[in-house]
């Protein structure tokens, strides 16, 4: 017999609190999204991506989940995203990025270097020169303490008011930093991840300052 959403939520409460997850904008298959059918909810959204990279990006959900925008953004405006959970693993570093090709390419619009996610809400600005239309909005996190992992949640969003195209946006913004998914790049426990190309919008926390050297350096 199928468990109700409430009962399943109670049974998985400890798992949901084990790590962190983006709760707004609603990620693909999120338990926070009231429009996701019960049978499609991922109650392990807080789990990291597979260490072999087999479900990078977005746990693969962008390829098998019907597209439905959970947020609408206007270029040049400021919005917020929310992270939920209790085990912050000492913080770490996060990035916010956009993809216009269904997850093949992610470009960074904001980095939070150090101390992320020690607060639950972050403001971010949608740049004025982004492209319009459907996009994937992604939150990625490299924890400071614990196993070397990559956490990633993605949301379908729609953007208007931008002056760019997908190609011009991809040319103007840095690539998403990717590590700990079998790609030959790994972070180091206890050492802050400092992105080599964080973009123009950067929030500093923990022990990271604007003069902190990039680490790790991966090619």
Curated annotation (Swiss-Prot):
Q: Which residues are glycosylated?
A: 80
**What's one GO MF term for it?**
metal ion binding
Q: Mind listing the GO biological process terms from this record?
A: chitin catabolic process; polysaccharide catabolic process
Q: Which residues form the signal peptide?
A: 1-18
Disulfide-bonded cysteine pairs: these are 58-154, 94-116, 185-218
What cofactor is needed? Cu(2+)
| Sites where the protein binds Cu(+) | 19, 89
Known EC number: 1.14.99.-
Annotated cofactor note: Binds 1 copper ion per subunit.
The record's family statement is: Belongs to the polysaccharide monooxygenase AA11 family.
**Would you tell me the protein name for this molecule?**
AA11 family lytic polysaccharide monooxygenase A
- Origin organism of this chain? Aspergillus fumigatus (strain CBS 144.89 / FGSC A1163 / CEA10) (Neosartorya fumigata)
